[in-house]
């Protein structure tokens, strides 16, 4: 029912998977999703107005806290919707086996990227949230090339890169490499240099198993950065030579990398 959709707008996306390979129908679903998310936001705001905080009791002590919780719920709903749409852009075995589905996938990716672009333009904070949550790295080439507003990611990549999670650091470096190819700008080069410096620091402090976990996935990213910014070639070559020396030293001690 409409009331159920207002409570949980993500129900709109719980549809037949074939919808995500049919461009015209997907456009309709996205229009419904956009309206449902807006209606849900409006209903939550109306709820706060209709149910004022009469006395400071329980866990909520101010209207500001209630507003903060509402905004967090809205952000969670919207980011979850975007994550579902991103997952729909993944190539499946069925796509590979049917040429007509590959054409449909390209169309669907274009439609979803256009939708995400509008969302990111209107809510840059949502772009940050989605990328801090992360998504399959094989989609980075799709999002960076298909979403014109992806350059705004350059603003928060240093913060993403500083996270303690190796997974987030790998994602950040990979994201920078694709952005560097797409936007060979001074700002992108500065962020790319920061990535190289961060990797150099991590190389000297990480244990061998975590070093392997970090550097194997980012090797292709470093190649892309070199392609976009040849001036960083010397720094990246130095980093890789240092990595090779450490690996050789560990191998001599019986701690070689696994193939």
Name each region found by the language model.
Residues 1-259:
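Extended alpha-solenoid scaffolds built from HEAT/ARM-like alpha-helical repeats
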């Amino acid at each position: 029912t409409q009331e159920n959709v207002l409570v949980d707008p993500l129900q709109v996306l719980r549809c037949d998977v074939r919808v995500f390979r049919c461009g015209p129908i997907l456009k309709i679903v996205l229009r419904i999703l956009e309206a449902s998310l807006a209606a849900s936001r409006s209903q939550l705001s109306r709820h706060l107005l209709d149910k004022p905080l009469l006395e400071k009791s329980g866990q909520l002590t101010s209207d500001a806290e209630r507003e903060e919780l509402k905004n967090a719920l809205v952000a969670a709903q919207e980011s979850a919707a975007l994550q579902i749409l991103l997952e729909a852009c993944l190539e499946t075995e069925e796509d590979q086996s049917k040429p007509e589905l590959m054409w449909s996938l390209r169309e669907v990716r274009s439609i979803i990227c256009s939708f995400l672009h509008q969302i990111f333009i209107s809510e840059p904070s949502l772009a940050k949230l989605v990328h801090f949550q992360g998504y399959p790295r094989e989609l980075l080439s799709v999002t960076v090339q298909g979403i014109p507003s992806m350059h705004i990611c350059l603003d928060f990549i240093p913060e993403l890169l500083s996270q303690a999670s190796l997974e987030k650091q790998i994602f950040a470096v990979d994201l920078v490499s694709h952005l560097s190819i797409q936007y060979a700008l001074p700002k992108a080069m500065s962020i790319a240099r920061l990535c190289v410096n961060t990797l150099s620091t991590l190389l000297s402090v990480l244990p061998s198993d975590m070093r392997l976990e970090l550097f194997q996935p980012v090797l292709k990213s470093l190649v892309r950065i070199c392609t976009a910014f040849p001036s960083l070639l010397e720094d990246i070559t130095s980093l890789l030579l240092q990595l090779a020396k450490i690996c050789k030293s560990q191998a001599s001690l019986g701690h070689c990398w696994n193939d």
